């Protein structure tokens, strides 16, 4: 017990210090003081190499800053909140391509002019998360109104009519459900319903629907989790159907664990740990060099994606959260061992002790392939979210291990104590 406490304390300290360094990097290098919002195309030393702004990453950074401000005393700093507010106002002014329409751009110029639109829901989802979190820290109702209105639009696109996304309906295209869509909606249900009974009730059926859809990605009698299935939950033919993303499955795992904990469903929790934590880890971990493969093929064939055998920052971040949350819930020491294994690899290979933050892209052997710290797909999100959540879970675990205080008060009978 004492050794376990010491190891947890060491990791809590490491995680805490790393979170401070990561946030310091983004606060120093990413803020656009002229137009608001954030630069995410940052080199190893934080130098901006492109001024384009990616709406989903803008929303993620606003959310991250607000969540830190709200959750940690040491981050309750005016400059953090001011930057989050400036990012939120930038999104309010420029994210939507043709207001009052809700479709958001994917890429904006530095001063907010639209460059590119994606035919997906993800810019809108992170816009929603940003607005809701801004409301939680500022109390300004206009942010919450934006979040609820955008959430309604996203639900309409996903469950009723996707025409507004602009995707052409082609006769040869398979009707496909990527796991990312119900995952993202489940994350929004968790975000909006947090400490809000009215919204929890409003989105309860949606949350159940999302979980049902995610669980349909467990295929072949529970032997694999596939990234894409048909709309009725069947395996698809070809490379698309065999495609696996271990990191995404692990991220879905902790999303599902949060849901199962809220529901008080121990059977579901065990199913999630087995299929969404242990299964993707054992199939996705590189036995020779360590680290999680980015993509895999369910039949063991060579994936067609050029980056399939690379090691990326975010799957390892999500694995750290998943295994620590799984251990916190189940007490299974095997899950704590896997957390340590992933965390050791991640801290050793991804973090940059010289300039701060983490490298995002390693080759299979674990050597840095791209020296950039941010780009179109890597911003201030997966790394700090991982570190913040792990710090909180480690803190809660250590509290559980604290010896009970000596109580000198007289004993109370069970009957009296229950009154």
UniProtKB/Swiss-Prot annotation:
GO terms for biological process: carbohydrate metabolic process; N-acetylglucosamine metabolic process; N-acetylneuraminate catabolic process. It catalyses: an N-acyl-D-glucosamine = an N-acyl-D-mannosamine. This is N-acylglucosamine 2-epimerase. The modification Phosphoserine is found at residue 418. Belongs to the N-acylglucosamine 2-epimerase family. The keyword Phosphoprotein applies. It comes from the Eukaryota. Catalyzes the interconversion of N-acetylglucosamine to N-acetylmannosamine. Involved in the N-glycolylneuraminic acid (Neu5Gc) degradation pathway. The record marks 380 as: Important for enzyme activity. It is an enzyme of class 5 (isomerase). Keywords: Isomerase, Phosphoprotein. One of its GO terms (molecular function) is identical protein binding. It comes from Mus musculus (Mouse). Pathway: Amino-sugar metabolism; N-acetylneuraminate degradation. Homodimer. Forms a heterodimer with renin and inhibits its activity.
């Amino acid at each position: 017990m004492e050794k376990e406490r010491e190891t947890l304390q060491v990791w809590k300290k490491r995680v805490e210090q790393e979170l401070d360094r990561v946030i310091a990097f983004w606060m120093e290098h990413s803020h656009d003081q002229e137009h608001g919002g954030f630069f995410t195309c940052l080199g190893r030393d934080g130098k901006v190499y492109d001024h384009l702004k990616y709406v989903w990453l803008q929303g993620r950074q606003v959310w991250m800053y607000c969540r830190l401000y709200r959750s940690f005393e040491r981050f309750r700093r005016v400059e953090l909140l001011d930057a989050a507010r400036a990012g939120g106002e930038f999104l309010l002014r420029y994210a939507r391509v043709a207001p009052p329409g809700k479709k958001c751009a994917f890429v904006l110029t530095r001063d907010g002019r639209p460059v590119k639109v994606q035919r997906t829901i993800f810019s809108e989802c992170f816009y929603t998360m940003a607005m809701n979190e801004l409301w939680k820290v500022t109390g300004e109702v206009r942010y919450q109104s934006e979040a609820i209105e955008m959430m309604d639009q996203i639900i309409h696109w996903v469950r009723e009519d996707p025409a507004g996304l602009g995707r052409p309906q082609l006769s040869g295209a398979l009707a496909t459900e990527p796991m990312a869509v119900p995952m993202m909606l489940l994350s929004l249900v968790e975000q909006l319903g947090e400490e809000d009974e009215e919204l929890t009730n409003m989105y309860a059926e949606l949350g159940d629907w999302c979980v049902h859809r995610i669980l349909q990605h467990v295929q072949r009698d529970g032997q694999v989790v596939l990234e894409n299935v048909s709309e009725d939950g069947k395996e698809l033919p070809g490379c698309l159907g065999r495609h696996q993303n271990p990191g995404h499955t692990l991220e879905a795992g902790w999303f599902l664990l949060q849901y199962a904990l809220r529901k008080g469903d121990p059977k579901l929790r065990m199913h999630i740990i087995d299929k969404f934590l242990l299964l993707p880890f054992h199939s996705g971990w590189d036995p020779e060099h360590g680290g999680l493969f980015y993509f895999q093929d369910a039949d063991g064939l060579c994936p067609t994606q050029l980056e399939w055998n690379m090691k990326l920052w975010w799957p390892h971040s999500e694995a750290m959260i998943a295994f620590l949350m799984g251990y916190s819930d189940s007490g299974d020491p095997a899950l704590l061992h896997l957390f340590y294994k992933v965390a050791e690899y991640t801290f050793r290979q991804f973090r940059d002790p010289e300039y701060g933050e983490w490298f995002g892209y390693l080759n299979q052997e674990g050597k840095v392939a791209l020296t950039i710290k941010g780009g179109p797909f890597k911003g201030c999100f997966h790394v700090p979210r991982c570190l913040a959540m792990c710090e909180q879970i480690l803190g809660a675990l250590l509290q559980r291990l604290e010896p009970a205080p000596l109580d000198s008060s007289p004993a109370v009978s069970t009957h009296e104590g229950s009154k």
